[in-house]
């Protein structure tokens, strides 16, 4: 197994009892140095002595139904809100589990409902007195008396997760029949906590051949709800609503000194998703969860190290409260983090995590029947996944790559096996070339929103790397940034409020999203400390880029709160009485010089108009889509949307350079063809040119001193040079 490091290593493959010869073959062909099991597979006896690291997935919260059934009061719980129901008379009956899979949840009839449930008159936002409602266990309904006719009502209640949502998802997707539904137990609860430490020790002792415990995960499932037809009903990869129990909430109350309300989690039915501006109470709850999750996870990691094993965390599933970009995470003491790679943004979600010895990306496709079936094209999916993620790897590499699922399925596609072999070799080469150095960054860019670093690289991501029509025009900005030569940070309005001097270490700020959301700020713009800090930043020479409805919030005669900086305002109807005369777009501009066609703004924005003195780059039917403006010594750029594409990445790149007054540095580690990118590693005396497309490309390459040469590249090709 031992090979030259350029020829082997840094790759993890899955296995199962019926693919031992195939596993051994791929250890050599792919140069793998680690083997893992997966949900629904078993580790073969024959491979326990293999000369490779062995990962074993360890489920901290499931795969022990005997314990869960013996302690039903310590099964993990979730806050759920019913649909809105309109009272047509003074009595109203609201069914709690209507629209939810009965296999997934069971109403918590154990704890004090008066204390932990909440009925709200949504027409008045008033909490309904507990004296006027009751729960009918037989029908599963809450009965409200003394209703106000034609008011809307909801019930917020606790339910037990009687089928682990991830296990349910895997069972539905793979068509598993007759499998026992795994119940999610709550490791935070006292009996289960004590038992879990004994259970972990027993597992490690019974698996002496295992080198790495791959924790899945610590300890609360992201919000994932299915309807009666087993379809996804609600999903939030960052959702906290399944991290609750009366036991946890009583601890929270003691720490913060005020009474908990279900509405802190329910949030009118929006569940504090990342588009909602977080309340003080929810931020307090997140901080509490981070501390408690880290404290308990550290106990497990310490046990792992006591046995001489490595502790790896899977980034996903039951990971709520770990928050890898926050300070508490590094106190856990993990050796590694592994996560699924769906694109460049999700690659950076993993590779940028501080405080671990190494990171690993699990690449797509997962070896499941939804891709590996007759007529399926796993090679195409693998190519798209690798080439998309490679941009981000070249900026901040993960340390390892891997695959998961049923190896038997993958082996039925020889072309796929061949392609992944080439990916493994290419990854090892680029890792050797760039390890230990920071690539050349032309400017420092900060994405500004309400979440800051807590949602670094996950901004505008509802479900892991999945497309949403309403936000792809914004998520594309984050994806573009994941592979561009900038030092990227994520800052919050709270960060600026705490110390506006942080802006002195930033060249360009990006504010991207719809108005009155957490991404653009909403109510925060009524705080003069925030608005004046950004005004001053730009006035003194900083760059500001706004996409969508940046700083959008109706207040004091403005919707776009930095309208005088952007030179752009939105017509909401309030300014129809004012005539607008600035509609002429310039024929050319530095930002659009590389565009080969009309700029793709995605969904764009309606009713945006330019103020006097603003330079319009693109307007369509008297609606501004792109414009630039000068404010003091600084510059701003406005775009109505910017979905991810190579051409749009170039538009963003030029926008950043222009707003930072860096036009003269365009031809520095630069490709004239936007389908091709250049990454320089000055410390390692290397640079590479990479073709991001699936066809050959011609380009002119500019080195760091602006000298140039012409180049032809094959499809997907990457070429390395000495500086």
UniProtKB/Swiss-Prot annotation:
Record InterPro entries: Class_I_gatase-like, Glyco_hydro_b, Ig-like_fold, Lact_bio_phlase-like_N, Lacto-N-biose_phosphorylase, LBP_C, LBP_M
Keyword field: Carbohydrate metabolism, Glycosyltransferase, Transferase
GO molecular function per UniProt: 1,3-beta-galactosyl-N-acetylhexosamine phosphorylase activity; 1,4-alpha-oligoglucan phosphorylase activity
UniProt keyword Zinc, yes or no: no
Enzyme Commission number, as recorded: 2.4.1.211
Highest taxon of source: Bacteria
Active-site residues, as the UniProt record annotates them: 317 (proton donor)
Keyword presence, Transferase: yes
GO biological process, one term: carbohydrate metabolic process
Cysteines engaged in disulfide bonds, as pairs: none
Catalysed transformations (reactions): beta-D-galactosyl-(1->3)-N-acetyl-D-glucosamine + phosphate = alpha-D-galactose 1-phosphate + N-acetyl-D-glucosamine
Function summary: Reversibly phosphorolyzes beta-D-galactopyranosyl-(1->3)-N-acetyl-D-glucosamine to form alpha-D-galactopyranose 1-phosphate and acetyl-D-glucosamine. Active towards galacto-N-biose and lacto-N-biose. Does not phosphorolyze galacto-N-tetraose or lacto-N-tetraose. In the reverse reaction has activity toward N-acetyl-D-glucosamine and N-acetyl-D-galactosamine, but not L-rhamnose, D-glucose or D-galactose.
Record family assignment: Belongs to the glycoside hydrolase 112 family.
Full protein name: 1,3-beta-galactosyl-N-acetylhexosamine phosphorylase Cphy0577
């Amino acid at each position: 197994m031992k090979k030259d490091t350029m020829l082997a290593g840094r790759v993890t493959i899955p296995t199962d009892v019926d693919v031992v010869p195939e596993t051994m073959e791929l250890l050599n062909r792919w140069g793998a140095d680690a083997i893992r099991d997966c949900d629904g597979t078993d580790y073969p006896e024959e491979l326990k002595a293999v000369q490779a690291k062995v990962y074993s997935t360890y489920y901290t919260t499931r795969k022990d139904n005997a314990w869960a059934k013996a302690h039903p009061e310590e099964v993990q719980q979730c806050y759920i809100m019913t649909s809105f129901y309109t009272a047509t008379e003074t009595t109203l009956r609201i069914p709690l589990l209507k629209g939810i899979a009965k296999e997934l949840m069971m109403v918590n009839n154990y704890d004090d409902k008066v204390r932990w449930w909440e009925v709200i008159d949504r027409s008045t936002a008033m909490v309904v007195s507990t004296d006027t409602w009751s729960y009918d266990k037989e029908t599963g309904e809450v009965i409200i008396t003394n209703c106000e006719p034609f008011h809307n009502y909801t019930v917020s209640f606790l339910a037990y997760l009687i089928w682990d949502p991830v296990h349910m998802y895997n069972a539905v997707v793979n068509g598993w029949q007759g499998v026992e539904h795994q119940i999610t137990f709550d490791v935070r609860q006292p009996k289960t906590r004590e038992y879990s430490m004994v259970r972990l020790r027993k597992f490690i002792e019974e698996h002496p051949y295992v080198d790495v415990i791959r924790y899945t995960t610590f300890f609360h499932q992201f919000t994932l709800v299915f309807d009666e037809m087993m379809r996804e009903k609600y999903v939030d990869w960052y959702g906290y609503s399944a991290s609750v129990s009366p036991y946890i909430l009583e601890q929270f109350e003691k720490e913060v000194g005020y009474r908990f309300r279900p509405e802190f989690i329910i949030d009118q039915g929006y569940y504090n998703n990342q588009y909602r501006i977080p309340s003080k109470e929810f931020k307090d709850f997140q901080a509490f969860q981070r501390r408690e999750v880290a404290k308990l996870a550290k106990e497990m990691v310490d046990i792992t190290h006591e046995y001489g094993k490595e502790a790896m965390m899977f980034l996903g599933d039951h990971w709520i409260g770990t928050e890898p970009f926050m300070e508490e995470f590094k106190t856990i003491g993990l050796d590694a983090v592994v996560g699924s790679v769906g694109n460049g943004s999700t690659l950076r979600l993993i590779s940028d995590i501080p405080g671990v010895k190494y990171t690993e990306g699990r690449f797509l496709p997962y070896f499941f029947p939804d891709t590996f079936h007759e007529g399926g094209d796993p090679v195409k999916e693998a190519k798209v996944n690798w080439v998309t993620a490679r941009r981000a790897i070249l900026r901040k590499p993960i340390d390892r790559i891997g695959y998961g699922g049923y190896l038997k399925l993958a082996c039925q596609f020889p072309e796929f096996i061949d392609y992944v072999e080439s990916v493994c070799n290419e990854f090892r080469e680029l890792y050797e070339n760039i390890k230990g150095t920071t690539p050349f960054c032309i400017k420092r860019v900060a994405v500004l929103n309400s979440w800051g670093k807590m949602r670094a690289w996950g901004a505008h991501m509802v479900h892991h790397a999945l497309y949403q029509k309403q936000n792809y025009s914004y998520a594309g900005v984050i994806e573009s940034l994941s592979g561009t030569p900038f030092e990227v940070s994520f800052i919050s309005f709270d960060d600026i409020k705490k110390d506006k001097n942080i802006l002195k270490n930033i060249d360009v700020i990006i504010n991207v999203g719809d108005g009155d959301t957490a991404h653009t700020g909403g109510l925060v713009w009524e705080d003069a400390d925030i608005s004046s800090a950004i005004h001053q930043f730009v006035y003194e020479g900083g760059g500001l880029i706004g996409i969508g409805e940046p700083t959008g919030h109706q207040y004091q005669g403005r919707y776009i709160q930095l309208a005088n900086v952007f030179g752009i305002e939105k017509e909401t109807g309030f300014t129809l009485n004012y005539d607008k005369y600035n509609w002429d777009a310039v024929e050319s501009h530095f930002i659009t010089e590389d565009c080969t066609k009309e700029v793709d703004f995605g969904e764009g924005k309606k009713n945006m108009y330019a103020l006097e003195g603003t330079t319009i780059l693109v307007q369509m039917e008297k609606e501004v889509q792109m414009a630039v403006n000068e404010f003091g010594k600084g510059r701003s750029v406005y775009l109505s949307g910017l979905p991810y594409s190579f051409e749009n990445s170039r538009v963003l790149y030029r926008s950043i350079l222009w707003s930072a007054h860096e036009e003269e540095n365009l031809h520095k580690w630069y490709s004239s063809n936007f389908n091709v990118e250049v990454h320089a590693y000055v410390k390692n005396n290397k640079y590479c040119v990479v073709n991001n497309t699936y066809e050959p490309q011609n380009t002119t390459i500019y080195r760091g001193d602006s000298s140039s040469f012409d180049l032809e590249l094959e499809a997907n090709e990457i070429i390395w040079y000495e500086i």
